[in-house]
């Protein structure tokens, strides 16, 4: 009885009994303890008998029997002898599977350094001994001696000696000292190290030194030494004296037909090691000459290197076919390695795949499954049913019946399949909606039928796509499939909370056609009593579908009690809309139906249905919409003919006008009035504008037609042109595509992104000539090449994102923080790009939201802002709200539900255990394939909008200028002299309505705080050049402007005007290199003028390419331009757009020419210059001056004597997120990354909720650098998880010690993934060798917190349905700890009282059995 209980206990303990995985160095004794015997011979198996050779690599005595429960010689067979060791062949009688787990070992005749600790940079052995890698290699590979014991000589420990030096030393000191070669020497040195003393010594050094590099070096060594001390690893274990041998079934030898064998490469590598080792043993026994032994030792070292990591040092050892052998390191790393191939993803049983076709008659929760497939997939279920029903006596009989496909089998199949959901998956599975559950409907044929509405989620179309089917087997799996993965439960997209079950294409066209109205249609003006009558009128031909009629419509409105009240009104509508109303669920307002329904409107319909009526109604409604849409699309008979593409008559006038303008510019260029760059820009602007005008004329022509109404008067109505209807409804095509069909194709781009200045004036209807076609091929082909690249890049980005965010899970309800991000609407120019409600919807308020201008609380803090509350915000015109955010969440190792807010895919506050990190990564990665790879084109047509050159106000209100400096010119207008000026217009309530960036040199007609009316133009500037504005009036004095040296003079042939162009420093003669062309302003007497209220001279340094059109001594007034600097031409400036931009942001890469930001607040001045750089000084009000060297070619935004604030831009450029974090803090960097990423996605029309990007930013910010460690466990300058610092600080606070000081650090996603606490997760991501080496040396523990680690060790993940399981394990563990403590104390007292009765025993046995069942 007792044994049985024990046996069951042993069975149930599988992967449950560990909570932490620790990795470390193996000591020789440990390796021997794993081993079941020493492998002495290189033989594998006997080629005649196929039996393993004794003591060889496949030896049965060491590794276990080849056949189950049978020894090698056949003396003992069968189960009854299990555990017996055969005296003849020495094999233990047991199962074969022990050959997968029993290890052997090889006793090495000479120690060998482990290549990972030697060559994986930084070399651990080198760091420990404080020697360069080159020197260690010289010793290891027998080129030099190293002193291990200096004795009384004047040699030093660790000194290298050549052969000659060694012999000399031996002559001088005989055996006073000891010097060795090879791994033994290194082993001796490592053995002789006193780690603690070394640590102390380094700590003292660290206190004394001041040099930064030295400090870095010492901290590196100190960290390594401390890791050794703490982990209990011994340094000499990095040199191996015993080599473990992998169990034979993990490096199999498979006989092929024809007497040959296929073998794992590892066997070759092991054979090599054993051969050399045995030869070395013999040589040592024979006392062979030193040089031979040395050579053999070196070869042994090399062969062990190859076994562990082939190709890491020297040339890789190759097999018979010139292919490098796969070593142990190669087995685990890379896509084909153990981690990614077998642990993170596996192939599964009970799956099939087939082509998909449309199932327009299916319900949303159904899919059509071919009978043949179903029969195969549900086989075991059918067998079981056949047996239990008594149709078959044995499994064999059942099998026969199924193979013969007897009639009864089909009945049973239908029964088995009923309510058994199956999973459908379409590769690539980019987000969680790529796998959904459906109920199968058996169909004839061989193709899976898919419901059209889920195509958007799968990104599927029916041009030959295939899908895979999986069968959830266990009851739990079926439950999860039905409750969580059913397509009806996934109506909303997790990326943005909008419905993803939206009709597209035909359905949209059908509904649009159905709800259009037509002037003077048949039956116009009829009075109908209800929608049924309207349908009757349409079916009998009394009225057309589009006719305007009056119908009595009954709406149902929910009252306070939640019941529906009927409300009937006579409504002006059309027949089609009335018919559509018949499928509307109760509780929807008719106003949503009484309009022309395009794709957006239909999406809104479904969204409203979901929010108002709940999931079930919404799903049924979506199905009805689809059926109706298909029916009426068929009725509409929409088709496209060539005559539908109507070319506007105005087109040719517009084009000829543009050609004249271009000719004029060309003339100006030839007469020297404009530069080549300006000409190019202007030509492109002209054509871009012409294209817009043609497009507008075409759309006006297409979109409207004039008809005669009932009164006999002409009336305009939307056109019934098929092409227009398709684009207008959102079914297919866009205005930009129609423009190419019937307008003009417009400007094209070259492959490098610059724009070709001759546009294609033809369109597809007229057809292109050869030249036009040739120009347009660039764009088209680049598009194809891009697509291929894009897919790979996008997949890689997704992989990195998932990896960095995988362990972020909702672990608690509320962390209690008051922190958050302040949200304001995003306004660019005169348009509100993103309204406030979109930004705060589904977030939790971090502080009470007050009614503007009062102290009245509108919404208390910690409230989830839903649609209704957002309406309240809009009604009270609130324009900034502080909301909780994951970036500021205080939870350690996870986030709380309140900081995350609404679960976008479900519409309520997020549940605990939801894997928000993975969802965020998928939401950002999935649209990645829709982003462009570079600059933005539409089918190659360059979209260069005419550049802005003025601000025209759209709303009446008040002007506000931010960080503006200006001078007032003699027309009393303001001329800006500051760089990053922002101009906003606010309305009467103080809400920001418009927001513009105004460049340096712009002329403003209104100042700060002045009123403007809508339509006024309040700022003007030249978009193609940047002026240098005079801030005082006076006379020009040229300094260092010397013709031929620093400037060239260009004279216009026609006008005779001459202008001076400053040369770039690189182009000047040597004499002119150090001169600085400057315009100085002096008064009438030639004295210097200072800028008003400063002691700074009024002088302006001119950069290269600047054009001066004034003469020396000319008079200038305030605000006049002194010179102009041409701006770069459009198109050639390569804006990194699309995917690479997103990747750069998440990788936190520093841009090529980053903006230079002010490190401190203070007054700017310039110090002594060096050859290529300027010295910028910032003097704060108190404290020491900060100085920075800036290259001369950088244009500065500050003048001497200006006051700057910390974080202000000193020189323009792309800002580095690291700088933003350092100077402006976490919130600013979050805002920056979120906005920049959103800009890229918005441009492509992709909607992603901000919080997904914030989740990734939180993971990028999870490390901190310790700046003041005090007496804590941390080192200064060490990189630690923020959560760990917070935990330590909480403890210190409780003890009354000062908190550890730290600075947050921003890591790119790849770096952040590799720097995660879990070494298993990091190793399965990238750079496996390096991660494992580091972890082993440090003796790291993996707490198995994240998802990846748990998948790899084969457990449920601590998220979703596995969250509770892990919580319970955690609780049990705590209870067990307490019980263990108690039992130690109480064992004595309990022993007397505790007697177990037979009943108790059987009860506990039953419990054990149940537990064992559960475990299985």
From Swiss-Prot:
Disulfide bonds: none annotated. Binds 1 Mg(2+) ion per subunit. Binds 2 Zn(2+) ions per subunit. Mg(2+) binds at residues 461, 463, 465. Pfam families: RNA_pol_Rpb1_1, RNA_pol_Rpb1_2, RNA_pol_Rpb1_3, RNA_pol_Rpb1_4, RNA_pol_Rpb1_5. It is an enzyme of class 2 (transferase). The keyword Iron does not apply. It catalyses: RNA(n) + a ribonucleoside 5'-triphosphate = RNA(n+1) + diphosphate. One of its GO terms (biological process) is DNA-templated transcription. Its EC number is 2.7.7.6. Keywords: DNA-directed RNA polymerase, Magnesium, Metal-binding, Nucleotidyltransferase, Transcription, Transferase, Zinc. One of its GO terms (molecular function) is DNA-directed RNA polymerase activity. Its cofactor is Mg(2+); Zn(2+). One of its GO terms (cellular component) is DNA-directed RNA polymerase complex. Zn(2+) 2 binds at residues 815, 889, 896, 899. InterPro entries: DNA-dir_RpoC_beta_prime, DNA-dir_RpoC_beta_prime_bact, RNA_pol_asu, RNA_pol_N, RNA_pol_Rpb1_1, RNA_pol_Rpb1_3, RNA_pol_Rpb1_3_sf, RNA_pol_Rpb1_4. CDD domains: RNAP_beta'_C (cd02655), RNAP_beta'_N (cd01609). HAMAP family: RNApol_bact_RpoC. DNA-dependent RNA polymerase catalyzes the transcription of DNA into RNA using the four ribonucleoside triphosphates as substrates. This is DNA-directed RNA polymerase subunit beta'. It comes from Haemophilus influenzae (strain PittEE).
């Amino acid at each position: 009885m007792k044994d049985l209980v024990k046996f069951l206990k042993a069975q149930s303990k599988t992967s449950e009994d560990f909570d932490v995985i620790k990795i470390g160095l193996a000591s020789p004794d440990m390796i021997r303890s794993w081993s079941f015997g020493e492998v002495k011979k290189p033989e594998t198996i006997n080629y005649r008998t196929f039996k393993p050779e004794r003591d060889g690599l496949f030896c049965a005595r060491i590794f276990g029997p080849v056949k189950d429960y049978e020894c090698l010689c056949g003396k003992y067979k069968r189960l009854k002898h299990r555990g017996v060791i055969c005296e003849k062949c020495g094999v233990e009688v047991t199962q074969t599977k022990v050959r997968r787990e029993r290890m052997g070992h090889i006793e090495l005749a000479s120690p060998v350094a482990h290549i990972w600790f030697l060559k994986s940079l930084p070399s651990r052995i080198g760091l420990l001994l404080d020697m360069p890698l080159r020197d260690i290699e010289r010793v290891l590979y027998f080129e030099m001696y190293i002193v291990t014991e200096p004795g009384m000589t004047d040699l030093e420990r660790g000194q290298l000696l050549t052969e000659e030096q060694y012999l000399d030393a031996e002559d001088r000191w005989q055996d006073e000292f000891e010097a060795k070669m090879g791994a033994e020497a290194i082993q001796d040195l490592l053995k002789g190290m006193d780690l603690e003393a070394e640590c102390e010594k380094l700590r003292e050094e660290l206190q004394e030194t001041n040099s930064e590099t030295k400090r870095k070096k010492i901290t590196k060594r100190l960290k390594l030494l401390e890791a050794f001390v703490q982990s209990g690893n011994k340094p000499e274990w990095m040199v191996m004296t015993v080599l473990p041998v992998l169990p034979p079934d993990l490096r199999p030898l498979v006989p092929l037909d024809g007497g040959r064998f296929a073998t794992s490469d590892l066997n070759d590598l092991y054979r090599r090691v054993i051969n050399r080792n045995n030869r070395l043993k013999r040589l040592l026994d024979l006392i062979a000459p030193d040089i031979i032994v040395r050579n053999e030792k070196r070869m042994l070292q090399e062969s062990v290197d190859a076994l562990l990591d082939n190709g890491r040092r020297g040339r890789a050892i190759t097999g018979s076919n010139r292919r490098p052998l796969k070593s142990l390191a190669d087995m685990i790393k890379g896509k084909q390695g153990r981690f990614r191939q077998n642990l993170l993803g596996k192939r599964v049983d009970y799956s099939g795949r087939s082509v998909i076709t449309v199932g327009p008659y299916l319900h949303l929760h159904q899919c059509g499954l071919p009978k043949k497939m179903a029969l195969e997939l549900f086989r075991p279920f059918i067998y079981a049913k056949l047996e239990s029903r008594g149709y078959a006596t044995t499994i064999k009989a059942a099998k026969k019946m199924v193979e013969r496909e007897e009639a009864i089998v089909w009945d049973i199949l239908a029964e088995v399949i009923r309510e058994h959901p199956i999973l459908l998956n379409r590769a690539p599975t980019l987000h969680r909606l790529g796998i959904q559950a459906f109920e199968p409907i058996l169909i004839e044929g061989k193709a899976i039928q898919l419901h059209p509405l889920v195509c958007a989620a799968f990104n599927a179309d029916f041009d030959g796509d295939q899908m895979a089917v999986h069968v959830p087997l266990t009851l739990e799996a079926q439950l999860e499939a039905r409750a969580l993965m059913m397509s009806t439960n996934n109506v909303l997209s997790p990326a943005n909370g909008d419905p993803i079950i939206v009709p597209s294409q035909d359905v949209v066209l059908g509904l649009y056609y159905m709800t259009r109205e037509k002037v003077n249609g048949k039956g116009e003006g009829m009075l109908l009593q209800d929608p049924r009558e309207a349908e009757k009128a349409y079916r009998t031909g009394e009225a057309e579908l589009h006719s305007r009629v009056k119908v009595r419509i009954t709406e149902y409105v929910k009252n306070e009690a939640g019941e529906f009240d009927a409300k009937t009104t006579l409504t002006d509508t059309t027949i089609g809309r009335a018919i559509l109303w018949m499928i509307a669920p109760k509780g929807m307002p008719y106003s949503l139906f009484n309009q022309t329904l395009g794709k957006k409107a239909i999406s809104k319909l479904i969204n409203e249905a979901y929010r108002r009526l709940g999931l079930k109604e919404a799903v049924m409604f979506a199905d009805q919409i689809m059926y109706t849409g298909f029916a009426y699309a068929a009725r509409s008979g929409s088709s496209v003919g060539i005559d539908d593409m109507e070319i506007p008559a105005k087109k040719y006038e517009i084009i000829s006008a543009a050609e004249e303008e271009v000719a004029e510019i060309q003339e100006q260029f030839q007469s020297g009035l404009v530069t080549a760059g300006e000409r190019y820009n202007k030509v492109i602007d002209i054509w871009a504008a012409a294209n817009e005008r043609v497009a507008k004329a075409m759309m006006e022509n297409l979109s409207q037609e004039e008809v005669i109404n009932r009164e006999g008067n002409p009336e305009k109505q939307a056109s019934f042109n098929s092409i227009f209807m398709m684009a207008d409804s959102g079914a297919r095509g866009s205005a930009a595509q129609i423009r190419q069909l019937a307008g003009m194709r417009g400007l094209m781009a070259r492959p490098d992104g610059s724009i070709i200045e001759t546009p294609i004036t033809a369109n597809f209807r007229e057809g292109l000539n050869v030249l036009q076609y040739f120009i347009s091929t660039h764009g088209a082909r680049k598009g194809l090449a891009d697509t291929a690249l894009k897919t790979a890049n996008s997949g890689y980005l997704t992989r990195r994102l998932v990896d960095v965010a995988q362990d972020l899970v909702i672990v608690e309800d509320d962390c209690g923080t008051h922190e958050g991000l302040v949200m304001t609407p995003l306004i660019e120019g005169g348009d509100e790009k993103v309204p406030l409600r979109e930004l705060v919807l589904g977030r939790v308020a971090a502080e009470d939201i007050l009614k503007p201008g009062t102290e009245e609380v509108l919404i208390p803090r910690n409230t989830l802002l839903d649609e209704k509350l957002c309406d309240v915000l809009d009604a009270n015109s609130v324009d900034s709200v502080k909301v909780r955010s994951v970036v500021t969440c205080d939870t350690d190792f996870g986030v709380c539900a309140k900081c995350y807010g609404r679960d976008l895919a479900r519409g309520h506050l997020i549940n605990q255990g939801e894997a928000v990190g993975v969802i965020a990564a998928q939401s950002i990665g999935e649209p990645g394939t829709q982003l462009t790879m570079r600059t933005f084109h539409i089918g190659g047509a360059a979209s260069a909008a005419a550049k802005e050159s003025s601000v025209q106000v759209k709303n009446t209100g008040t002007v506000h200028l931010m960080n503006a400096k200006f001078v007032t010119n003699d027309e009393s207008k303001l001329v800006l002299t500051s760089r990053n000026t922002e101009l906003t217009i606010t309305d009467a309530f103080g809400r920001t309505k418009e927001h513009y960036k105004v460049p340096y040199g712009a002329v403003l007609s209104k100042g700060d705080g002045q009123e403007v009316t809508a339509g006024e133009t309040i700022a003007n500037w030249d978009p193609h050049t940047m002026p240098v504005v005079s801030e005082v009036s006076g006379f020009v004095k040229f300094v260092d402007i010397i013709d031929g040296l620093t400037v060239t003079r260009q004279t216009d042939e026609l006008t005779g005007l001459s202008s001076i162009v400053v040369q770039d420093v690189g182009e000047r003669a040597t004499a002119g290199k150090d001169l600085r062309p400057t315009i100085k302003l002096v008064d009438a007497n030639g004295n210097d003028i200072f800028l008003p209220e400063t002691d700074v001279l009024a002088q302006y340094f001119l950069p290269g390419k600047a054009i001066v059109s004034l003469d020396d001594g000319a008079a200038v007034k305030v605000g006049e331009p002194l010179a102009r600097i041409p701006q770069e031409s459009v198109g050639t400036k390569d804006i990194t757009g699309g995917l690479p931009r997103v990747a750069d942001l998440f990788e936190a890469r520093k841009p090529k020419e980053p903006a230079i930001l002010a490190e401190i607040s203070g007054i700017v001045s310039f110090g002594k210059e060096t050859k290529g750089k300027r010295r910028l000084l910032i003097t704060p009000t108190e404290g020491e001056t900060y100085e920075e060297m800036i290259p001369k070619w950088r244009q500065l935004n500050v003048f001497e004597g200006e006051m700057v604030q910390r974080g202000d831009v000193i020189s323009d450029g792309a800002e580095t997120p690291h700088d933003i974090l350092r100077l402006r803090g976490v919130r600013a960097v979050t805002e920056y990354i979120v906005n920049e990423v959103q800009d890229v996605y918005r441009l492509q029309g992709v909607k992603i909720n901000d919080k997904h990007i914030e989740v990734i930013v939180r993971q990028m910010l999870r490390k901190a650098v310790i700046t003041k460690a005090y007496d804590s466990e941390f080192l200064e300058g060490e990189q630690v998880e923020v959560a760990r610092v917070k935990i330590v600080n909480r403890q210190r606070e409780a003890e009354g010690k000062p908190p550890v000081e730290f600075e947050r650090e921003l890591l790119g996603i790849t770096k952040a993934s590799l720097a995660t606490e879990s070494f298993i997760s990091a190793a399965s991501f990238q750079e496996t060798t390096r991660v494992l080496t580091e972890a082993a040396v440090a003796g790291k523990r993996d707490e198995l917190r994240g998802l990846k680690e748990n998948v790899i060790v084969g457990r449920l993940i601590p998220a979703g349905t596995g969250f509770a399981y892990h919580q319970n394990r955690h609780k049990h563990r705590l209870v067990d700890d307490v019980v263990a403590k108690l039992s130690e104390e109480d064992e004595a007292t309990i022993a007397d009282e505790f007697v177990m009765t037979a009943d108790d025993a059987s009860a506990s046995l039953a419990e054990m059995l149940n537990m064992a069942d559960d475990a299985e």
